[in-house]
Amino acid sequence: MMSTELFWTRVGVYNETMWPLVMAMTVAAALLTYRVFFTPGARTDLWMKAFLSFAFAWNGIVFFLVSVRNPISTFTGVPLFILVSLLFAVDIRAKKTHFQLPEAAWKKGLTVFWIALVFLYPLVGWPLGHVYPRTLLPMFPCPLTVFAIALVAAAVPNVDRRIFVLLLPWALMALPKCFGALDCYEDCILFASGVYGLVELVRNWRARRVAAREELPVQREIAG
């Protein structure tokens, strides 16, 4: 297990080294979020999937394998992030996921809430004593996962469920952070988003089962 001091030292080095790309990714995420909210469609889907594919690959390889390497990131984070990256890339052609704000007002509000928290990650960490460069910026692996969960949960039922499922383990594994692991309490946001994502995934799964049961008698009646 990586020590708390070593973790935050490596975060600081990563920020000081990679800040131009980290800032560019944050701006790109903000602009693409605007498109999802106000101009959803095929072009927005394409650009968002391409961005997410790159962001997950970058974090999986550069952040986990090079900058903040430890057993958990190497053997759990890397495979999960690379798989998610590949699935977003594949979905550019498959077109299973369509990003947009949900119709229900409560769910729309939650989507905005989660994405706002992503961009507020550094501010959440500030009163906890995490100031730049030793702070988690919006497109770090954990806030990026929150960002993706919010987007795919909003897209339900028009979503590749494999992506949805693969996003959840990394989020739910953040529970120890809520009890002081690595002095990274801001990742309680990540854990909470994982719980939210799991609830939405189960709700969608149940809704699909109910719809399938209701459709079966109709099909039998037509066939008969």
Q: What residue spans do the PLM features occupy?
A:
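Aromatic-anchored segments of alpha-helical transmembrane domains
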Residues: 54-62, 113-124, 168-180
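Membrane-helix boundary connector in multi-pass membrane proteins
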Residues: 66-69, 153-165, 171-187
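Membrane-proximal helix-loop-helix units in multi-pass membrane proteins
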Residues: 74-148
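N-terminal topogenic module of multi-pass integral membrane proteins
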Residues: 1-69
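Loop-to-transmembrane alpha-helix initiation sites
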Residues: 73-78, 180-194
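Membrane-interface capping segments at transmembrane-helix boundaries
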Residues: 38, 93-99, 201-218
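Membrane-interfacial loop-to-transmembrane alpha-helix junctions, especially the N-terminal start
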Residues: 41-53, 102-111, 156-167
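Hydrophobic cores of alpha-helical transmembrane segments in multi-pass inner/ER membrane proteins
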Residues: 20-33, 79-95, 143-155, 189-206
